[in-house]
């Protein structure tokens, strides 16, 4: 009979910024995960704060990256933005999930990074920041469903 191991707690490698003493100073979290793939296409993480996600996706499309920022739902789960969401900090996870065969292998090396993909994501996030800062939800502690 197969057994499933259920850990008593989850391990997350962090510097502690989601801890209560630091969380009060964090306005929002934008997690950029696996952004360097040449075939960049970002679906919408289902756990992310919708208002943050909407701003970034709208900005990306306005910059002409309609094939990058797509409306396909992505069920990531267990990613690095979870502790921030649990601390009540609005968070968005931009993660490349489709068709990257080198993920978590010894072949996942810097030569696989696309400067163009990094530029697209960096440009989009940078252009999104003023809208995020001006949004009524910025700095509040609503649920991730907004």
Segments from the language model and where they lie:
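Acidic/histidine-rich catalytic neighborhood of metal-dependent amide-processing enzymes
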Residues: 1-55, 59, 67, 73-81
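Sec-exported extracytoplasmic/periplasmic mature domains
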Residues: 15-19, 57-61, 65, 86-89, ...
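Residue-level preference for alpha-helix termini and adjacent loops
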Residues: 25, 41, 83, 102, ...
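Short glycine-rich, acidic/polar surface loops and turns
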Residues: 75-94
